[in-house]
């Protein structure tokens, strides 16, 4: 889900996205990990990121990831937003928890957002090198996980 407004989301996907698409009827919402690409002109500022955080909390999803576009084509290069441009830690009630960077290949960090006593887990991820995929999927000996988030289990 790359935008909080269904009309704008429909524009991004170039097709109509019905509002009921985010109802998640019959799905254990605690297992959902919402991912939002950072795209210039859409989610590209602290204000837009906060609206996305608030929408995620309103839906009841426990975690969201903001992911930078990889430089794989002209569109991605022209619409790239660096994680630092979002200034996630400038948003009130966002708290840094940990970071794992892989030099020039990967920038990853985790945060928590608290709104009215409701907690939202946030991860920020940007792979600058499209050929770099180390730690994208991790097997911890018991579960297959995406990234370094402890509770992000792939079924």
Task: Give a label for each model feature.
Residues 7-20, 25-129:
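Radical SAM enzyme [4Fe-4S]-AdoMet core and its adjacent flexible, acidic
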Residues 4, 39, 70-71, 143, ...:
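Short, solvent-exposed loop/turn segments at secondary-structure junctions
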């Amino acid at each position: 889900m790359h935008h909080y407004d269904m009309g704008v989301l429909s524009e991004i996907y170039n097709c109509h996205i019905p509002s009921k698409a985010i109802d998640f009827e019959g799905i254990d919402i605690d297992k959902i990990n919402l991912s939002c690409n950072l795209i210039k002109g859409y989610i590209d500022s602290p204000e837009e990121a906060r609206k996305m955080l608030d929408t995620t909390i309103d839906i009841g999803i426990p975690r969201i990831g903001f992911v930078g576009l990889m430089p794989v084509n002209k569109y991605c290069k022209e619409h790239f937003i660096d994680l630092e441009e979002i200034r996630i830690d400038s948003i009130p009630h966002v708290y840094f928890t940990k970071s794992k960077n892989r030099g020039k290949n990967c920038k990853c960090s985790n945060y928590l957002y608290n709104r009215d006593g409701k907690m939202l887990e946030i991860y920020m991820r940007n792979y600058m090198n499209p050929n770099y995929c180390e730690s994208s999927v991790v097997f911890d000996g018991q579960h297959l996980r995406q990234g370094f988030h402890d509770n992000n289990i792939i079924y």
